[in-house]
């Protein structure tokens, strides 16, 4: 039987329509969005999961992830080169200094970082007069490391030399090659460090609670594109839900193996600590945000006290959590 073009189109539409109706978040238009991230870290995993399993697509978005240094990503958000940046600390500090940006949600609220050292360095105190590698200067990991050293009676500006050693692989290599005595690396790289013969001195997540990553946007987009921001935040929050659901462990471990380029057993070992770092509601308590700002003031990253409303805007993530809670069976 032959059909006219109009009838064929009608039949095709009838087949497609039920699939569209069954997807509650699916929109007609597709928006291209860019998210800047600073490194191959656990902090990007919620976004990766949301992208891999089509959660942004279901929200009517096509995602492009762009590797970018934190300070540059803030500028890129302001100028509109990217819609979002995950460097929560850099976004918040920039906002505190008057730049037109805000953090919309917190993706990781626990510093899932290890301090690892070469053989013979058995305590944090033994780092006095020695060197410690970090990814970069001025970012959240830098400030977190200075705060951790202070908690252990070490002045990071006087008693310890903080040296930029780059990402986790190059930091481990820097210890092995004798360029530094220790380094700060994130989960799951402590498993790689241990296999390389390095010693774990401390896990920062045991002694401090700080927002390590989020989703930052410009004040202009908050005012002019609230629907886009709401959908992006909702997809990212669904990514957190996916990671935290133990039923998805196999899929999450698979993403870890692919993203971090590690073995399956290493991903399995690091899985538990990693998922603990993701706040289920995408927000943190005010006192945690205040502590983050206080550390930034103490280390000279910002000078003046500011209200939290100047640096964060959690309206979108709170609305998204309410919507998702209602949608649950």
Model regions: which residues?
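Bacterial N-terminal signal peptides that target proteins for export
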Residues: 1-13
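Bacterial N-terminal signal peptides
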Residues: 10-22
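Sec/Tat signal peptide C-region and signal peptidase I cleavage site
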Residues: 23-29
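Short, glycine-/small- and polar/acidic-enriched structural segments
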Residues: 30-167, 171-177, 181-187, 200-209
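Short linear loop/turn motifs
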Residues: 64, 71-72, 161-163, 269-275, ...
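Pocket-lining segment of extracytoplasmic ligand-binding domains
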Residues: 89-90, 169-259
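Secondary-structure end/capping motifs
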Residues: 223-303
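Conserved C-terminal helix/tail region of periplasmic/extracytoplasmic solute-binding proteins
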Residues: 293-329
């Amino acid at each position: 039987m032959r059909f006219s073009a109009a009838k064929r189109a009608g039949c095709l539409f009838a087949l497609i329509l039920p699939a569209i109706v069954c997807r509650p978040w699916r929109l007609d238009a597709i928006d291209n969005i860019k998210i800047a991230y600073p490194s191959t870290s656990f902090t990007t995993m919620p976004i990766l999961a949301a992208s891999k399993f089509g959660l942004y697509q279901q929200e009517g978005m096509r995602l492009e992830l762009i590797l970018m240094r934190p300070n540059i990503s803030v500028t890129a958000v302001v100028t509109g080169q990217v819609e979002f940046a995950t460097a929560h600390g850099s976004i918040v500090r920039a906002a505190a200094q008057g730049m037109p940006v805000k953090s919309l949600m917190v993706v990781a609220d626990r510093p899932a970082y290890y301090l690892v050292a070469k053989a013979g360095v058995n305590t944090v105190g033994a780092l006095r007069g020695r060197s410690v590698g970090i990814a970069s200067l001025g970012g959240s990991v830098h400030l977190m490391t200075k705060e951790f050293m202070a908690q252990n009676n070490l002045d990071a500006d006087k008693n310890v030399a903080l040296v930029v050693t780059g990402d986790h692989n190059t930091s481990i290599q820097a210890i092995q090659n004798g360029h530094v005595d220790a380094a700060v690396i994130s989960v799951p790289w402590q498993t790689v460090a241990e296999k390389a013969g390095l010693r774990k001195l401390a896990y920062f997540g045991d002694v401090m609670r700080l927002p390590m990553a989020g989703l930052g946007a410009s004040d202009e987009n908050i005012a002019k594109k609230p629907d886009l921001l709401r959908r992006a935040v909702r997809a990212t929050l669904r990514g957190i839900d996916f990671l935290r659901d133990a039923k998805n462990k196999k899929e999450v471990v698979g993403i870890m193996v692919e993203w971090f380029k590690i073995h399956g057993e290493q991903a399995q070992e690091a899985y538990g600590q990693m998922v603990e770092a993701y706040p289920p509601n995408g927000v943190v308590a005010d006192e945690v945000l205040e502590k983050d700002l206080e550390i930034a003031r103490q280390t000279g990253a910002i000078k003046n006290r500011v209200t939290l409303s100047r640096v964060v805007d959690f309206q979108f993530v709170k609305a998204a959590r309410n919507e998702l809670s209602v949608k649950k069976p």
